[in-house]
């Protein structure tokens, strides 16, 4: 007799500079049964990129076919190329008991909440303070002062949406944040086992 459980769709959102990318990388490195969501795109592969690992590379015609068939959870056009989240990749992993990590902004997260709320566990990552966020953005040395101000204004807007998420954490220490999200993921996996057991002879 075997107890089966679906995986969890772990959605992480944060303002730019709050540490979402670093936390995601560490979670994937440390967690078992957790994979990164692989997006689909119509752009050409760059040197070294692997189809199915970095992206699913498809023609624009194929991309639009999948959109019309309802096979894209979310999609957008960026610099003349389309990018989207393929439904099959997410659902196949979840049904196999593998959790999927998706780092997206609040708009993408809210769209997913509408489509598959029961499968989503969402975490909003906050910086310790707006001043700390400003310092982190300045340390990147990739944006000028006006761009940093724009990002900070956008961050305020994003932070105002945090109450719609299942969990909110403050990232003042990367390792502690990774540990906290790992605990959330394990708790939600156990909850799924209790809620939805299916027994096989």
UniProtKB/Swiss-Prot annotation:
Q: Which domain of life is it from?
A: Bacteria
Q: Which residues form a coiled coil?
A: none
Give the GO molecular function terms.
ATP binding; guanylate kinase activity
| EC number, UniProt record | 2.7.4.8
Gene Ontology cellular component?
cytosol
* Gene3D superfamilies, sorted: Guanylate Kinase phosphate binding domain (3.30.63.10), P-loop containing nucleotide triphosphate hydrolases (3.40.50.300)
Q: Answer yes or no on keyword Kinase.
A: yes
**Guanylate kinase-like domain location, by residue?**
7-186
Q: Which UniProt keywords apply?
A: ATP-binding, Cytoplasm, Kinase, Nucleotide-binding, Transferase
Electron transport as a keyword of this entry, yes or no, is no
- Describe the reaction catalysed, as an equation: GMP + ATP = GDP + ADP
Quick one: which residues bind ATP? 14-21
Q: Which Pfam families match?
A: Guanylate_kin (PF00625)
So what does this one do?
Answer: Essential for recycling GMP and indirectly, cGMP.
Matches recorded under PANTHER family: GUANYLATE KINASE, GUANYLATE KINASE-RELATED
Q: What protein does this entry describe? A: Guanylate kinase
């Amino acid at each position: 007799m075997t107890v089966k459980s679906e995986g969890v769709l772990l959605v992480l959102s944060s303002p730019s500079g709050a540490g979402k990318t670093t936390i995601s990388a560490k979670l994937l490195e440390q967690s078992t049964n957790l994979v990164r969501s692989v997006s689909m795109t119509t752009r050409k592969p760059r040197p070294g990129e692997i189809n199915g690992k970095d992206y699913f590379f498809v023609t624009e015609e194929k991309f639009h076919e999948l959109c019309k068939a309802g096979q894209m959870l979310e999609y957008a056009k960026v610099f003349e190329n389309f990018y989207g989240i393929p439904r099959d990749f997410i659902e196949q992993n979840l049904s196999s008991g593998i959790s999927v990590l998706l780092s997206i902004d609040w708009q993408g997260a809210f769209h997913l909440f509408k489509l598959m709320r029961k499968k989503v566990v969402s975490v909003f990552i906050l910086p310790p303070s707006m001043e700390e966020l400003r310092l982190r953005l300045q340390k990147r040395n990739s944006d000028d002062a006006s761009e940093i101000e724009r990002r900070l204004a956008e961050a305020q807007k994003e932070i105002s949406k945090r109450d719609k998420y299942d969990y909110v954490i403050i990232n003042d220490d990367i390792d502690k944040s990774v540990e906290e999200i790992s605990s959330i993921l394990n708790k939600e996996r156990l909850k799924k086992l209790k809620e939805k057991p299916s027994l096989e002879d």
